[in-house]
From Swiss-Prot:
Name this protein carries in UniProt: Recombination protein RecR
Primary role: May play a role in DNA repair. It seems to be involved in an RecBC-independent recombinational process of DNA repair. It may act with RecF and RecO.
A Pfam family hit: RecR_C
Gene symbol of the encoding locus: recR
GO biological process: DNA recombination; DNA repair
UniProt keywords, alphabetically: DNA damage, DNA recombination, DNA repair, Metal-binding, Zinc, Zinc-finger
UniProt record similarity statement: Belongs to the RecR family.
């Protein structure tokens, strides 16, 4: 009975991943246990190490193992531009285009009043402080084109519009209702270059 319980616990843990239901979680669990025990152990160790060592960058809030991430420390980055994204996955998608060379602020979420997520929950005060540090001249709003992403961009825009900063939004080449991490790199690059 203990083995069955352990299997159920594994399946439930895998179901926490986005887009993974009972069938997919079961398939993954059976595969790892039946055909890839070394892979299962490597996955377990990698998850443990990441959970123990990854933290949020003190400047931009992305994931890092240091106090300040490599992007924030890179002197080649254009510190006058600050791109606001919802998640580290969105930041990664923008980075992979090679079209952006400024800095980031990762909200680690989006406003969602129905879910009880407000401005304090996504660190808007920290964003406003960072944007008004005297170095930033342009804030690029790269939140997703969902209802929550649009609301988040609007609140940020309202909070910053009187502070003498140039506010831009990714161009609408990114399909409405999409999430950046799932959009092809060419579309993201054009949207970033054609922002308004």
């Amino acid at each position: 009975m203990a083995d069955l319980n352990s299997l159920d616990v594994l399946i439930q843990a895998l179901r926490r991943l986005p887009g993974v239901g009972v069938k997919s979680a079961s398939r993954m669990a059976f595969h790892l246990l039946q055909h890839d025990r070394p892979g299962a152990l490597a996955l377990s160790r990698a998850l443990q190490v990441a959970a123990d060592q990854m933290r949020h960058c003190e400047r931009c809030h992305t994931f890092t193992q240091a106090d300040i991430c490599a992007t924030c420390l890179d002197p080649r980055r254009d510190a006058s531009k600050l791109c606001v994204v919802e998640t580290p996955a969105d930041q990664s998608a923008l980075e992979r285009t090679g079209a952006y060379h400024g800095l980031y602020f990762v909200l680690m979420g989006k406003l969602s009043p129905l879910d009880g997520i407000g401005p304090k929950d996504i660190g808007l005060k920290g964003l406003f402080d960072r944007a008004c540090d005297g170095t930033v001249q342009e804030v690029i709003l790269a939140t997703n084109f969902t209802a929550e992403g649009e609301a988040t961009a609007h609140v940020i825009s309202e909070g910053l519009k009187s502070r003498g900063l140039r506010l831009t939004r990714l161009a609408r080449g990114v399909p409405v209702g999409s999430e950046l991490e799932y959009v092809d790199l060419g579309t993201i690059a054009h949207a970033l270059l054609d922002r308004r």
